[in-house]
């Protein structure tokens, strides 16, 4: 009986993987979705009934398992380096000239491939079985997200050969899947993702693998940094090997004999990029020959044998339907243009910021204007210019308000800023924005408390400030449209968990003007408890490196407000933590508080991320560039030019042999 069950399980797995490959890799399905689901359900039922036959390479792993507590950190034995960028033909020709000179090859062969806009992953297989999927992280240390990676249908759980191999590539979300996901989020009253890249990254970083399993993610491999027992001599041969192993390969990878052909390829895809079913933001060009790659080597940041041609920011024309004022959490009155919806760089743009009155006047944007817009860095929509030649004479200049458009309170420019601010701390618009900021990922990280939910809770009078979040009751939430018992429980659980956050996240969440995430960390480290910070004077604050007079004044002013004192009392009563963890207390090493540290090279006992965490836990700030303001330079193996610059500037250099004493 047991052998019959085992054979049935193995046959089902083989059949499911066959059809999975046909559908997700070859794009040539032979059975319907319903038939595929029936096979999967049968396998899951058998594995649950007979757990002794469960296997890490079973296709049932793709539906997602139990939620995780956190993602373990993993070190990349071969660093996942970033690529040098070229933004013009000249940049590509300069790259070609360097390659030709250093390899003594006048016409080296290149491989060009589309630069998919997604999340870089490292996949490790042992004996052909997927054993680890990790994010790039900072290039040396990433996160182990294996359960989530297994839900991506185009990533084989088992290769066609029993190889020990590492494969790197890009996980992404198609435009169609992105639109569907955002539609579903809108129907649930949740905030949409800004673009497909954020959607893919956000999905794969969910602690519950069942979430990415439902989000139709895809994957294209782009390199094989390690393979045991096989001799690959070129990038193009590696691509062919990946296809044979069962991966879906991007169909537009091309091999070229000249840089002129590469440039034509880049120009072609710059024009055709919008016609693809997924987002790309450039073209990656690699030297094909592995021996030549090895000969050129890499800097501490980039391989010398590859470059990324970055497309210019995508632009589009639209019409200004309206201009209105948005009131931010610190009272800033920001002019926003309401546009005829237009699609740019993976998302539909309906609004763009003009930042302040001066920029509005400088660009002379009027209601009814035809404008050119783009996404700055392909992220933030901005108005590039007005098409003055398209004006009809009916366009209306915008009259900037002298008071807050929401609460009608006085608006002022503080300290000659370009920004006009509402000075009423009780302004409803500010209150809502403060709550949204407070619950954001970098602050208290309250899952499910996005803009639309905050708007709903505020409009129903359930919350008026950030402290009210902690006094919400299940029956209040369950009675709201779009909420049920389960969603109410989930939100309340996320709120309860946020009470345990360290002081620095609470401090950042309070939204004090000029206090960003890094400043909040420095202040929390120095003062240890909110009560101590509330007593601080300007001179106490400016003693801390990176805390200037303007920020110090803003902090002291914030804690002098009666509104702030009432808020803190409510947060304390709710049980919100106001203390920084003891292991980060300054007593561990006060000599490093506020110091600037640069790390260069590689270290035997630490990854770069681990060193950064240790140093920042002691109150220092890790920066990437050596300057006269740098206090210490930590030097490992193969340090590059940073060591030389540190010596020229007479800076304190900490060798790896002295690292333990330093820490």
From Swiss-Prot:
Annotated binding of Zn(2+), by residue: 404, 407, 422, 427
Binding site for NAD(+): 33-37, 82-83, 113, 136, 170, 286, 310
Domain named BRCT: residues: 587-663
Catalytic-site annotation from UniProt: 115
GO biological process: DNA repair; DNA replication
Top EC group: ligase
Known EC number: 6.5.1.2
UniProtKB keywords: DNA damage, DNA repair, DNA replication, Ligase, Magnesium, Manganese, Metal-binding, NAD, Zinc
Cofactors that this protein relies on: Mg(2+); Mn(2+)
Catalysed reactions, semicolon-separated: NAD(+) + (deoxyribonucleotide)n-3'-hydroxyl + 5'-phospho-(deoxyribonucleotide)m = (deoxyribonucleotide)n+m + AMP + beta-nicotinamide D-nucleotide
SMART domains noted in UniProt: BRCT (SM00292), HhH1 (SM00278), LIGANc (SM00532)
Pfam families the UniProt entry points to: BRCT (PF00533), DNA_ligase_aden (PF01653), DNA_ligase_OB (PF03120), DNA_ligase_ZBD (PF03119), HHH_2 (PF12826), HHH_5 (PF14520), Nlig-Ia (PF22745)
Function, in words: DNA ligase that catalyzes the formation of phosphodiester linkages between 5'-phosphoryl and 3'-hydroxyl groups in double-stranded DNA using NAD as a coenzyme and as the energy source for the reaction. It is essential for DNA replication and repair of damaged DNA.
Family: Belongs to the NAD-dependent DNA ligase family. LigA subfamily.
Protein's name according to its UniProt entry: DNA ligase
Organism: Natranaerobius thermophilus (strain ATCC BAA-1301 / DSM 18059 / JW/NM-WN-LF)
């Amino acid at each position: 009986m047991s052998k019959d069950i085992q054979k049935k399980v193995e046959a089902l797995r083989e059949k499911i993987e066959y059809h999975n490959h046909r559908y997700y890799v070859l794009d040539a399905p032979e059975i319907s979705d319903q038939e595929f689901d029936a096979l999967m359900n049968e396998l899951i039922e058998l594995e649950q009934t007979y757990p002794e036959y469960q296997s890490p390479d079973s296709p049932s792993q793709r539906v997602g398992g139990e939620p995780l507590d956190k993602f373990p950190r993993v070190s990349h034995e071969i660093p996942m380096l970033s690529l040098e960028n070229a933004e013009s033909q000249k940049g590509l020709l300069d790259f070609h000239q360097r390659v030709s000179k250093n390899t003594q090859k006048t016409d080296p062969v290149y491989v060009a491939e589309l630069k998919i806009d997604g999340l870089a992953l490292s996949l490790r297989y042992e004996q052909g079985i997927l054993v680890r999927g990790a994010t790039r992280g900072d290039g040396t240390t990433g996160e182990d997200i294996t359960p989530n990676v297994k839900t991506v249908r185009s990533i084989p759980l088992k290769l066609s050969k029993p190889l020990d191999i590492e494969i790197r590539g890009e996980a992404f979300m198609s435009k169609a899947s992105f639109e569907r996901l955002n539609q579903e989020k809108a129907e649930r009253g949740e905030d949409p993702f800004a673009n497909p890249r954020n959607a893919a990254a956000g999905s794969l970083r969910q602690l519950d693998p069942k979430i990415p399993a439902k989000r139709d993610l895809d994957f294209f491999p782009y390199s094989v940094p390690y393979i045991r027992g096989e001799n690959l001599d070129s990038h193009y041969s590696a691509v062919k090997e990946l296809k044979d192993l069962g991966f879906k390969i991007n169909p537009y990878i091309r091999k070229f004999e000249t840089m002129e052909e590469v440039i034509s390829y880049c120009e072609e895809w710059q024009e055709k990029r919008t016609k693809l079913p997924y987002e790309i933001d450039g073209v990656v060009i690699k030297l094909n020959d592995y021996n030549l790659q090895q000969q050129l080597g890499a800097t501490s940041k980039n391989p010398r044998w590859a470059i990324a041609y970055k497309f210019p920011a995508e632009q589009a024309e639209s019409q200004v339907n309206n201009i209105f004022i948005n009131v931010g959490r610190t009272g800033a009155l920001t002019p926003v243009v309401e546009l005829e919806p237009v699609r740019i760089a993976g998302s539909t743009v309906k609004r763009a910021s003009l930042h302040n009155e001066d920029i509005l006047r400088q660009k002379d944007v009027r209601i009814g204007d035809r404008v050119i817009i783009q996404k700055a860095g392909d992220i933030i929509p901005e108005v590039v210019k007005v098409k003055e030649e398209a004006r009809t004479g009916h366009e209306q200049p915008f009259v900037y308000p002298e008071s807050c458009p929401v609460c009608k309170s006085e608006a002022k420019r503080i300290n000659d800023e370009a920004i006009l601010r509402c000075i009423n701390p009780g302004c409803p618009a500010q209150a809502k924005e403060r709550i949204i900021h407070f619950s954001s990922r970098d602050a208290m990280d309250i899952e499910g408390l996005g803009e639309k939910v905050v708007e709903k809770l505020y409009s129903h009078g359930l919350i008026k400030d950030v402290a009210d979040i902690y006094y919400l009751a299940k029956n209040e939430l369950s009675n709201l449209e779009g909420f049920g018992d389960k969603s109410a429980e989930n939100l309340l659980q996320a709120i309860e968990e946020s009470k345990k956050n360290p002081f620095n996240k609470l401090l950042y969440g309070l939204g004090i003007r000029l206090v960003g995430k890094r400043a909040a960390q420095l202040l929390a480290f120095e003062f240890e408890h909110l009560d101590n910070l509330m007593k601080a004077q300007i001179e106490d604050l400016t003693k801390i490196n990176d805390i200037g007079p303007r920020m110090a004044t803003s902090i002291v002013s914030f804690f002098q407000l009666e509104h702030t004192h009432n808020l803190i009392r409510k947060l304390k009563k709710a049980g919100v933590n106001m203390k920084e963890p003891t292991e980060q207390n300054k007593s561990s090493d006060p000599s490093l508080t506020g110091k600037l540290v640069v790390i260069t090279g590689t270290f035997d006992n630490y990854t770069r991320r681990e060193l950064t965490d240790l140093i920042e836990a002691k109150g220092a700030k890790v920066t990437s560039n050596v300057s006269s303001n740098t206090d210490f330079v930590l030097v490992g193996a193969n340090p590059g030019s940073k060591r030389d610059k540190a010596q020229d500037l007479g800076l304190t250099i900490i060798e790896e042999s002295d690292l333990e004493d330093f820490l």
